């Protein structure tokens, strides 16, 4: 009896000793024999401290992505300065980034902590398809935004007419349709997924070499090439416009001095003003010419309104084009080259002639924008406030538009730089791994880090808009009820 009991006890001890290494292999402590951490009965593959750090960090990224992109969408639809047709591209980008945060990231958090897929093969395939679809849509939307900016800068007048809501929505639909064409082939058989799926089967993107080349070209490398070429062209165009503006400014400065020398009478001190307005009452000046007829003023006003609208829609016009299109029939009679660059320097230059050209105020200081009354022998008479000339108003709008376009190009460059830093490591790994032997495959932690580096791009886009775009910054503050 004693011998049998001892044998039974030894067998029980042996079986328990055999179970301990199995627990250690699953993830427990081989030295202490402790069981691995678990959450809701699901055994985790990493220590508890790593679970806490990973869960908090990745959840924070998800939260930032959701909040930021929701604010972008709400800003465009609720803040009037942002309610313009080209911002629908940004809405589409925000929706793509939002779907990454809602449909893709949470499953990856669970997969990172558990290190095995417990949601079944159907959910696995749908998750992988959504991953490729949403990330590709985000990248292609960036490409569409770059193209839209390029056309707006290089061909502002024509593209302002072509940039209709229907055209923009068609481009956005094309972006999502192309993303679906790139992401869907694995669902219809272009994959190397196993026929049977269990808890130990990894849920990962297919490594079928043909599809890897196809999807990487469509999702990343071709859009990257297009965006690089487009941004270089935008940079060159912006530099060219700045050089044209600098040349026009020098030419206009010389013209201003020449016109001032011809228009200033000897009785007016040259240090007080550079020229004298033809619309004020001075005994020293000849009587002003008759004002234009009502019919001519009506036509001029209508034409100027159209030019102003074209400038507003174009948002970035060549300096020579602006001056030529903005100057009405009452412009100063100068040479053709000077006429093209007249409105570039920012000085007030108004004219009131119909058949006879009269030079008017070209001043540097606010006090000399009205006619000086020094040396006048007649009693002072009230001076009516002078209306701002149309082409000066349009020139000011173009100066603002130029500043906006420079900021937009800079923002686009930053978005592209962040995009390359975030996604290039992932797609290099995605292309290289299927063509190398198993020994060159990266560790699961490195794969997870590179994957999340790509996901972070969806969180950074709204942050970039907030920092570098004043309208988005104001809209965010308004939505969050911050005082501006």
UniProtKB/Swiss-Prot annotation:
Biased amino acid composition, Polar residues: 253-280, 361-378
PANTHER family found in the cross-reference section: ADRENERGIC RECEPTOR-RELATED G-PROTEIN COUPLED RECEPTOR (PTHR24248), TYRAMINE_OCTOPAMINE RECEPTOR (PTHR24248:SF174)
Main localization (coarse): membrane
Record's bilayer topology term: Multi-pass membrane protein
Family label: Belongs to the G-protein coupled receptor 1 family.
Biased composition (Basic residues): 295-306
InterPro entries per the UniProt record, alphabetical: GPCR_Rhodpsn, GPCR_Rhodpsn_7TM, Octopmn_rcpt
Function summary: G-protein coupled receptor for tyramine, a known neurotransmitter and neuromodulator and direct precursor of octopamine.
Subcellular location: Cell membrane
Cytoplasmic side, ranges: 78-87, 148-167, 238-411, 471-484
Lineage: Eukaryota, Metazoa, Ecdysozoa, Arthropoda, Hexapoda
Pfam families the UniProt entry points to: 7tm_1
Glycosylation positions in this chain: 13, 198
Name used for this protein in its record: Putative tyramine receptor 2
Compositionally skewed regions (Low complexity) per UniProt: 350-360
Bridged cysteine pairs (disulfide): 124-203
Alphabetic keyword roster: Cell membrane, Disulfide bond, G-protein coupled receptor, Glycoprotein, Membrane, Receptor, Transducer, Transmembrane, Transmembrane helix
Bilayer-spanning residue ranges: 55-77, 88-109, 127-147, 168-190, 216-237, 412-433, 449-470
Gene Ontology terms for molecular function: octopamine receptor activity
GO cellular component: plasma membrane
Gene3D superfamilies membership: Rhodopsin 7-helix transmembrane proteins (1.20.1070.10)
């Amino acid at each position: 009896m004693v011998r049998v009991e001892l044998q039974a006890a030894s067998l029980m001890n042996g079986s328990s000793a055999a179970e301990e290494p199995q627990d250690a292999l699953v993830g427990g402590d081989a030295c202490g024999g402790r069981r691995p951490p678990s959450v809701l009965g699901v055994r985790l593959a990493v220590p508890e401290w790593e679970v806490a750090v990973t869960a908090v960090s990745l959840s924070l990224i998800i939260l930032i992505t959701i909040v930021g992109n929701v604010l972008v969408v709400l800003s465009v639809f609720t803040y009037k300065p942002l309610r313009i047709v080209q911002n629908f591209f940004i809405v589409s980008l925000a929706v793509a980034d939002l779907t990454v945060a809602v449909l893709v990231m949470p499953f990856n958090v669970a997969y990172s902590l558990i290190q095995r897929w417990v949601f079944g093969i159907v959910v696995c395939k749908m998750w992988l398809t959504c991953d490729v679809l949403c990330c590709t849509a985000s990248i292609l939307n960036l490409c569409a935004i770059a193209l839209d900016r390029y056309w707006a800068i290089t061909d502002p007048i024509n593209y302002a007419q072509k940039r209709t809501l229907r055209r923009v929505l068609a481009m956005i639909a094309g972006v999502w349709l192309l993303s679906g064409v790139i992401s869907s082939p694995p669902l219809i058989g272009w994959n190397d997924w196993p026929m049977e799926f269990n808890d130990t089967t990894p849920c990962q993107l297919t490594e079928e070499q043909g599809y890897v080349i196809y999807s990487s070209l469509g999702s990343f490398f071709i859009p990257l090439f297009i965006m690089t070429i487009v941004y270089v062209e935008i940079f060159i165009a912006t530099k060219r416009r700045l050089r044209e503006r600098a040349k026009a400014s020098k030419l206009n400065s010389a013209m201003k001095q020449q016109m001032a020398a011809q228009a200033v009478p000897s009785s007016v001190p040259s240090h007080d003003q550079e020229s004298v307005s033809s619309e004020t009452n001075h005994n020293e000046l000849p009587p002003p010419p008759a004002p234009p007829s009502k019919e001519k003023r009506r036509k001029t006003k209508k034409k100027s309104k159209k030019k102003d609208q074209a400038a507003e829609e174009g948002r970035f016009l060549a300096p020579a084009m602006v001056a030529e299109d903005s100057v009405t029939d009452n412009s100063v009679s100068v040479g053709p080259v000077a006429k093209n660059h007249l409105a570039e320097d920012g000085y007030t230059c108004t004219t009131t002639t119909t058949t006879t050209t009269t030079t008017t105020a070209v001043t540097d200081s606010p006090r000399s924008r009205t006619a000086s009354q020094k040396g006048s022998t007649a009693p002072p008479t009230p001076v009516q406030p002078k209306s701002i000339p149309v082409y000066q108003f349009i020139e000011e709008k173009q100066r603002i538009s130029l500043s906006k376009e420079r900021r937009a190009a800079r923002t686009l460059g930053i978005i592209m730089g962040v995009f390359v830093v975030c996604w290039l490591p992932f797609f290099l790994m995605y292309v290289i791994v299927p063509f190398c032997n198993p020994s060159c495959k990266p560790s699961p932690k490195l794969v997870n880090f590179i994957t999340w580096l790509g996901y972070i791009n969806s969180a950074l886009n709204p942050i970039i808009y907030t920092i570098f775009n004043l309208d988005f910054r104001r809209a965010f503050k308004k939505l969050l009820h911050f005082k501006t």
